[in-house]
A protein has these predicted regions:
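Solvent-exposed interaction patches of small proteins and small membrane subunits
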Residues: 1-60
Length: 60
């Protein structure tokens, strides 16, 4: 990305959110969590990625 540090920081933060959600899902699967709860986290990941894509595209 050829944008300033503030925009890169914002995009990086968005990826950190996705990473946190992924780690949570991995933990939930290992612990045998309720499927619906896992799906809720999966949806959160999808939304975070959607926002990431929008943010990157807006800065293009």
């Amino acid at each position: 990305m050829k944008h300033g540090p503030d925009k890169r920081k914002s995009v990086s933060h968005r990826l950190a959110i996705v990473e946190g959600h992924l780690r949570k899902v991995q933990s939930m699967v290992k612990q045998g969590a309720y499927c619906i709860d896992i799906i809720h986290q999966s949806r959160a990941i999808q939304q975070a990625l959607k926002h990431f894509d929008q943010q990157v595209l807006a800065q293009h």
